[in-house]
Structures are given as structure tokens and as C-alpha cells.
From Swiss-Prot:
Protein family membership: Belongs to the complex I subunit 2 family.
Enzyme category, top tier: translocase
Source organism per UniProt: Roseiflexus castenholzii (strain DSM 13941 / HLO8)
Name of the protein in its database record: NADH-quinone oxidoreductase subunit N 1
Main location: membrane
UniProtKB keywords: Cell membrane, Membrane, NAD, Quinone, Translocase, Transmembrane, Transmembrane helix, Transport, Ubiquinone
Gene: nuoN1
């Protein structure tokens, strides 16, 4: 098992992200900028443009590499021969094959995750370009890129040490981004809280890895002590079967790993950091944190549990411990209830969406429960439901927090009261926010409806009927606080009728998110087949 030169194309998007981050940081540092406001605005604009163009290029390369999405035709003697040849070469040396060094998978699952993170980073960049970045914009965008790189590696990791390093790369970048606005009262506090809770979760996750490593080493010693890489997910899965799956050391390690990642995806009771951080961080960072970061945590948790602990899967029963699906069922139950009920009294829009995000984490756990089924078809459906929900949720939340970023920039407040009479001040923004909020609520025919429908079906097929029933009830409860947005924007009188414009780049990001939410709602099969193809690989 060694790294070959032919493996380089398989990690080309990650290499491009690394080079792009260094380029953005270097160009900002090496260019002499004036100290005036105009010079700083130009500095932020150039850094944002370079980041957006670079991320767009990386997205295109990742899209072309994903040969299961489409096949690049052979050159036919035309003006596009150079591009077609390049595309064919990218696909030939792209995804597929066994994991690199056994630790980095380049399967369809990785391809879709990679595109999701890069797309989210691109939209976040557009939102940030429409926001006021007052200092060191090169650092801001470089950290955003490095965080995206960490997330991409997280989703591809099939080895514990690589997963941990990727998690830290992503997290350390986000800690700094959360506290980016040092002149703000809330931003440094948000960064500090996120750092403290994130450091604790990383320590818990690492301790779980050490316990799991000890289990594998112990079992391997019993089997004769053959040389192995005990931190590979596949090696853990090979030993965690039969009676060994009930080993206290393995179960304890699994519990610590779930708890460590539980902080990253903000499930109850590991959610306490989320409302304060979401409210205090710069709005574009909150948008990225609530979407791409959560998606990366879920995808790592999914690959880890289904690859390293398939022998301890159990069944999603609330009344007894029966494997990791029992743990996830309990977490899903309390997360759905606490997240939605805690959102009811909130008056700050970002804090309200933070608790909403916690509730959505509970819905997402329902899709993972279907892994308890012995049927590959059921497992494929559950995996596809998880991926579909993450994509739709990311688009919807990015757009929603994008609207709040515009409001904060224009009005200086992100309270619900600041949204009163919004339709009289910015009709297009009001219409887009209405669509996005209705999608979060799961109203048909928007994409959020299908996302919830698929995860509820996954939970039902897994046999977690009581849990699905409670989730449906909490969905109805969530309508109350989602409709508060609509009441404020459309019904309550505006404190002052002063029209304002949405920055063009931020407007483009919000429009793109909204259009995709509507399109995926009207045509859910547009990406469902592709997602199912990727899910079938992950469900084997």
C-alpha cells in the first residue's frame, strides 16, 4: 500500500484548494495596500473575486471528474478538442479505485460531498463580498478555503488519524472566522466559545479513537498479532463483529466518537454552543458554519459508523441499548424536541435559525437509522435521503442567512423586529426569504418538503415509527416560529419605510439558492438518481 503518481488526479480538487488558499493569502500579503477606506474596499473586492473565481474553477474540475454524473465525449476534430481531451483525462484518472493508502476514498460519495462543500464556500464568498469585511480580507477568504479543504478530506477519510486532522483543519479555520470581527462585542465571544467547545469535542473524539485503537490492537493480538494499520475504518470493522462487537472497550470508544462528532453537528445535549456562536459570528460565517460544517460532520459520522462499526449497528429502539442506532434514535428524539421548542420564544432571527438548525440535525439522524436494515435497497435509500437533505438544507440555510447578512449590513440589526414591513423596503428580498423559510418549514412543493419526506420515510422503514411521529409533530410546531418571519415581513408595520438595495454579489448568491430550492422542489428527481448512485456505493 503506497502512494502512486497516478493517485494525484484523484485528489486534484483538494490540491487546488490548498494552492488557492495559499494564493489568496499570499496575494493579499504581498500587495501593498493603502490605509484608507477606499483602499481597504478594493483589497476586499480583489480577494473576494480571486476566491470566487478559484472556487468556481475547482467546482468545475470536481464536476468533470465525477464521471458517474456525465461522460465527456471523445474529441471529434473541433475547436473544443483541447477542453474535451482535458475533460477525458480528468475523468480517466479521477474517482474510483480503492482508497489512497487505505485512508482517502475517492468514490461517488466523496465526489458529491466535495461538490457540496465547494458550492457552499462559493456562495459564502459571494455573501461575504456583499458584506463589510473591514480588515485582513485575504486571511478571511484563505481560512474559508482551508476550512473547505478540511471538510472535503473529512468526507473522504477512511482512517481515524486523517479524519481527526481534517476535522482540526476545518475547525481551527472556523474558530478564527467566528471571531473575525474583533471590533464587535459578540464576534470575539462567539469565536472563544466555539474554540472552547470545539477543543473539548476534539479531545473527546480523540479519546474515542484511542479506545477504539486499543480494542483493535487487543483483538489483533488474540488473532496472532499480524501487522495491520489499526486506525483504518475497515480494520476496525473487521474485528468489531460477533461477540467482539459487544466489547466494553469498543462500545466506550464508539460513545466518545459519537459524542465528539455530536458537538460538530450540534445535536442535543452537545448543542449549547450553537445559538451564541450563530448569533455572534459574522453572518456569512454563520451561513457556512450552519451548512457546510454540519454536512461535513454528518458525512464523517455516517462513513465512520457504517464502515468501522457495522457489527454494532443494532436496531433503533428507544427502550433499550441495541447498538449505535439506538444511541442515534435517542439523540434524534431529544434533538428534534429541544431544537424546535427552544426556537419558539426567540426574538433574534439568527438565534431562532440556530435552534431551527439543531432541530434539523435531529431530522437528519432519522436517515442514518435505516442502516439497521439488512436490505441494501433500504440502506441505499437511507443514505440517499441523508445526502439529499444535506444538499437542500445547505442551499436553504445559505440563502436564509444570506438575507440576514444583507439586513444586518443595511439595517444594523438581525432581530425579527427589524424585518417588519420588509416588503415595503425590499420586495425581491422579501419574496426570496419567504420561499426559503417555507422550504425550511417543509411546505410543498419546495425542496424542503421532499427532504423531510425522504428522511421520514427512512425512519419509518427503519421501524422507528414513534420517533417519526414525534418528528412530524415537531415539524407542525416549527410552523409557528417560521411563520413569525412571514408575519414580520408581510403583516407587521415597518418602523421606517426606507428602501434599501441588496448588494449585487450577495443578491446573486441568494437568487441562486432560491432558484435551486424551487427547482429541486418541482423536480426532485433531478438529482435523486445521481444521489442514489452515490448512496449505493456507500451502502455496500
Amino acid at each position: 500500500m503506497s502512494f502512486q503518481i497516478t493517485d494525484i488526479p484523484r485528489i486534484l480538487p483538494e490540491l487546488m484548494l490548498l494552492l488557492l488558499g495559499l494564493l489568496v493569502l499570499g496575494s493579499d500579503v504581498l500587495t501593498r495596500w493603502g490605509r484608507g477606506p477606499a483602499a481597504q474596499l478594493e483589497r476586499a473586492r480583489e480577494a473576494g473575486q480571486l476566491t470566487a473565481v478559484g472556487l468556481g474553477l475547482v467546482f468545475i474540475v470536481g464536476l468533470v471528474q465525477s464521471r458517474f454524473l456525465f461522460t465527456v465525449p471523445d474529441p471529434a476534430g473541433g475547436p473544443l478538442d483541447v477542453l474535451l481531451t482535458l475533460g477525458r483525462n480528468l475523468q480517466t484518472g479521477g474517482p474510483g479505485g480503492s482508497p489512497i493508502l487505505g485512508a482517502f476514498a475517492t468514490d461517488e460519495f466523496t465526489m458529491i460531498a466535495r461538490l457540496t462543500f465547494i458550492g457552499a464556500a462559493f456562495l459564502t464568498t459571494l455573501l461575504a463580498m456583499g458584506y463589510r469585511l473591514t480588515a485582513n480580507p485575504g486571511e478571511f477568504y484563505a481560512l474559508l478555503i482551508f476550512s473547505t479543504l478540511g471538510m472535503s478530506i473529512m468526507a473522504a477519510a477512511t482512517e481515524f488519524i486523517l479524519a481527526y486532522l481534517a476535522l482540526e483543519l476545518s475547525s481551527l479555520s472556523l474558530y478564527v472566522l467566528a471571531g473575525y470581527f474583533r471590533e464587535s462585542e459578540r464576534s470575539p465571544e462567539a469565536g472563544l466559545k466555539y474554540f472552547l467547545f470545539g477543543s473539548l469535542s476534539s479531545a473527546i473524539f480523540l479519546y474515542g479513537i484511542s479506545l477504539t485503537y486499543g480494542f483493535v490492537a487487543s483483538e489483533n493480538q488474540k488473532a496472532g498479532g499480524a501487522p495491520i494499520i489499526a486506525t483504518l475504518f475497515s480494520e476496525v470493522g473487521r474485528f468489531a463483529t460477533g461477540d467482539a462487537a459487544g466489547s466494553p472497550l469498543l462500545i466506550l470508544g464508539m460513545l466518545f466518537i459519537i459524542a465528539g462528532l455530536g458537538y460538530k453537528i450540534s445535536v442535543v445535549p452537545f448543542h449549547t454552543w450553537a445559538p451564541d456562536v450563530y448569533q455572534g459570528a459574522p453572518p456569512p460565517v454563520t451561513a457556512f458554519l450552519s451548512t457546510a460544517s454540519k454536512a461535513a460532520g454528518f458525512l464523517l459520522l455516517y462513513r465512520l459508523l457504517t464502515t468501522a462499526f457495522p457489527g454494532a449497528v443494532g436496531a433503533p429502539r428507544l427502550e433499550e441499548f441495541n447498538g449505535w442506532t439506538s444511541i442515534l434514535a435517542i439523540l434524534a428524539l431529544v434533538t428534534v424536541i429541544v431544537g424546535n421548542l427552544a426556537a419558539l420564544p426567540q426574538t433574534n432571527a439568527r438565534r431562532l435559525l440556530a435552534y431551527s438548525s439543531i432541530g434539523h440535525a435531529g431530522f437528519l439522524l432519522l436517515a442514518v437509522l435505516l442502516w439497521a436494515s439488512a436490505s441494501p435497497v433500504d440502506r441505499t435509500f437511507g443514505t440517499a435521503a441523508l445526502i439529499y437533505y444535506l444538499i437542500v438544507y445547505s442551499l436553504t440555510n445559505l440563502g436564509s442567512f444570506g438575507v440576514l447578512a444583507v439586513l444586518t449590513n443595511a439595517l444594523g440589526s438581525d432581530d425579527l423586529s427589524a424585518m417588519q414591513g420588509l416588503w415595503r423596503r425590499n420586495m425581491s428580498l422579501t419574496l426570496m426569504m419567504t420561499i426559503l423559510i417555507l422550504s425550511l418549514a417543509g411546505i410543498p412543493p419546495l425542496a424542503g418538503f421532499w427532504a423531510k419526506f425522504f428522511v421520514f420515510m427512512a425512519g419509518y422503514q427503519a421501524g422507528a415509527v414513534p420517533l417519526v411521529t414525534i418528528a412530524v409533530i415537531m415539524t407542525v410546531v416549527s410552523l409557528y416560529y417560521y411563520l413569525r418571519f412571514l408575519k414580520a415581513m408581510w403583516i407587521l408595520p415597518a418602523p421606517a419605510i426606507t428602501p434599501f438595495k441588496t448588494p449585487p454579489v450577495a443578491n446573486a448568491a441568494i437568487i441562486l439558492s432560491t432558484v435551486l430550492v424551487v427547482l429541486l422542489g418541482l423536480l426532485p428527481n433531478l438529482i435523486w438518481g445521481t444521489i442514489s448512485s452515490a448512496a449505493s456505493v456507500a451502502a455496500r
